[in-house]
Amino acid sequence: MDEERYPALPWQGWKIVKRLGRGGYGSVYLAQRNSAGVMEDAAVKVISFPKNEEDIEADFTDGYDLVSVRNKYKNMLHRYVDEYQIMLAFKGQTNIVSCDDFEAKPHKDGIGWDVFIRMELLTPLTTLIKQYAGIIPEEMVIKVGKDICSALMLCDSKNIVHRDIKPENIMVSEFGDYKLGDFGIARTMDHTTQATTVGSERYMAPEVIKREEYGKEVDIYSLGLVLYWMLNNRKRPFIDADHLPTHDEIELAQARREKGDPLPVSYTHLRAHETLRHL
């Protein structure tokens, strides 16, 4: 098996050690540098778009000319610039992932970009909870709720709606502080009341799915679903916590939630209801 080749980083002294995760357009890596004998760690998100030549060919097949294709990917770059600017505004805050640097390099053919975002190294919530074979401790769920509520208060102070709160976007520091990350689709309130569908439908508020007008309350709803999921044996609402659901059961549960049915108390054995009520 060939050894994986990592991209070169644009910051002096920083080198990629290993891949931590992979997403639709890129990957997150562990990066290190030796600073006066002290080893520093960071997480680096590397996003490349287009992903490959097939994406470009598809654009031309769809009728784009060269200028339009270049503009398409330039607009995609603006999304990541916006994400960096939002995270930079929150740099140093306890409950929001701290972003340290950003670089964007155009592709040699002039079509597309490589984006590098360097952030503090943290543990994903989804990784942390794997150590719990059974029930996740209520104290942990309450701590997640309080910390991410603090993050949302900061977002509110900047008139920002995150729009994609889910377990994968919550991190924890070595000191036990939970942090909200990935502001890639966050928007200011001025641009959020429009009926746009973004984020993960698994944790999306019904009004967003229905393309109705919405505001900051959709983030609170999504956080509530994350906490419910943690307390309900990692099952979302309307799914029995005590057995492995079928595909049809998952689809039916999603449809009931989108319809706005009250969340069931019985499946959570009253535990989730009482904990969420006291947050």
List the predicted regions and their residue ranges.
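Activation segment signature within eukaryotic-like protein kinase domains
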Residues: 144-145
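Conserved short submotifs of the Hanks-type protein kinase catalytic core
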Residues: 110-125
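Conserved small/polar residues in nucleotide/adenosyl-binding loops
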Residues: 268-275
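Catalytic-loop of the protein kinase fold
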Residues: 156-172
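Conserved catalytic-loop aspartate of Hanks-type protein kinases
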Residues: 219
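Short beta-strand micro-motifs within the conserved protein kinase catalytic domain, predominantly
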Residues: 98-113
